[in-house]
From Swiss-Prot:
The encoding gene: wecG
Keyword Electron transport carried by entry: no
NCBIfam families in UniProt: PRK03692.1, wecG_tagA_cpsF
Gene Ontology MF terms: lipopolysaccharide N-acetylmannosaminouronosyltransferase activity
Known catalytic reactions: UDP-N-acetyl-alpha-D-mannosaminouronate + N-acetyl-alpha-D-glucosaminyl-di-trans,octa-cis-undecaprenyl diphosphate = beta-D-ManNAcA-(1->4)-alpha-D-GlcNAc-di-trans,octa-cis-undecaprenyl diphosphate + UDP + H(+)
Stated name of the protein: UDP-N-acetyl-D-mannosaminuronic acid transferase
Length: 246
């Protein structure tokens, strides 16, 4: 068996994370032996670690997800500090989603898209079909009423989707995925936040060099100064990291 179909796990503050070496490792793991895994993918960054710490419901939701991976460079550095021999790298959720969509297009895997503004969702569908010939079997923008959720779950189930990506922000998307899986368990679910906006060019992502240097957070802060309160909140995570309270 190819070693890439397996992955070690690491624990940070009680949360178990999958340790992928790189993007190829992540893809080989999720498509082990040609079969797409079923379960829920959740990207973990420092901000989400803080939310998990402070919100018991979110912690329970995320703990229940099968595939929690290091999306933030701070989390990667913490894993490396706690486990010096760990061969783990950041796998950005936006990049993983694109790679999954490209693979789905190649293999004809049925995909259902949830979330985003109606116009952004429509552009996402069109681009996915044009770029990778993705087999999109259904979609629903993020503007639906609570009483419409059950009917949406039934639509997703009837579509036969094997990948369901949900762009509703955390923890709404995690709650949605948990509840939808009760109706349609046989799929890989992925919470993708604002990925559709980035994919369609409505939101500009940090240049590659900033990403490589682990400074994507700084680029976002410079682009959106209103994020300063969110960034200051992360000082608590830095304290955990530098005091070894991991």
């Amino acid at each position: 068996m190819n070693n890439n179909t397996m992955a070690p796990t690491y624990t940070l503050r009680g949360l178990q994370l999958i340790g992928w070496r790189d993007m190829q490792h992540a893809l080989d793991y999720l498509f082990a032996d040609g079969h797409l895994k079923q379960g829920t993918l959740v990207a973990i960054n420092a901000e989400k670690m803080l939310t998990i710490e402070d919100n018991a419901e979110v912690r329970e939701l995320i703990n229940a997800a099968e595939f929690k991976y290091a999306d933030g460079i701070s989390v990667v550095r913490s894993v490396r500090k706690k486990y010096p021999q760990a061969q783990v790298s950041r796998v950005a959720g936006a990049d993983l989603w694109e790679e999954l969509m490209a693979r789905a297009g190649k293999e004809g895997t049925p995909v259902f898209l949830v979330g985003g503004k109606p116009e952004v969702l429509a552009q996402t569908e069109a681009k996915l079909r044009n770029q990778w010939n993705v087999n999109i079997v259904g979609s629903q923008d993020g503007y639906f009423k609570p009483e419409q959720r059950q009917a949406l779950f039934e639509r997703i189930h009837a579509s036969g989707a094997q990948i369901v990506t949900v762009a509703m922000g955390s923890p709404k998307q995690e709650i949605f995925m948990r509840d939808c899986r009760l109706v349609h368990p046989d799929a890989l679910y992925m919470g993708v936040g604002g990925t559709y906006d980035v994919f369609t060019g409505h939101v500009k992502r940090a240049p590659k060099i900033w990403q490589t240097l682990g400074l994507e957070w700084l680029y976002r802060l410079l682009s959106q100064p209103s994020r300063i309160k969110r960034q200051l909140r992360l000082l608590r995570y830095l304290r955990w990291h530098y005091t070894g309270n991991l």
